[in-house]
Amino acid sequence: MIKDIAFTAYPSDNVKSTREWYEKMLGLKFSGAFEENGVEMYNEANVGPSCFALMTSQWVQRKPGTGVGVAFEVDDIEKTAKSLRDAGVSVEDIYTTPVCKVTSFDDPEGNKVTLHQSTR
């Protein structure tokens, strides 16, 4: 079911300024913003075979500084989400971007787990 870790994400109240800090301080090269209404909501930098992402705190529903999230790469997000729902897990609606599909759910401890399916 799980193939790989797709990305690690930090929540950010201001993705643009946080991205600029990571670019300046750590030399990360981000691939391009995903924006809504002119606001940078998500951006990622390739790091080895995976990537590091900055994501608006409203998407991940966590405040900055509250920990790292994990996103597991799957072959078929619809099938995986259905399987989880059938097992009684409350899975969020699948969100589609120009490059991927994403959904999330909480583990038994309340940690947010994300499923990711690349569409590129």
Predicted feature descriptions by range:
Residues 49-53, 62, 110-113:
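Short, charged/polar, Gly/Pro-enriched secondary-structure boundary elements
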Residues 66-81:
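Mid-chain, well-packed structural core segment of small domains
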Residues 43-44, 59-62, 94:
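Short secondary-structure boundary/capping segments
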Residues 40-42, 69, 100-102:
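Short hydrophobic/aromatic beta-strand or adjacent loop that forms the aromatic wall/cage
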Residues 9-51:
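Core segments of cupin and vicinal oxygen chelate
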Residues 1, 31, 81-120:
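Vicinal oxygen chelate
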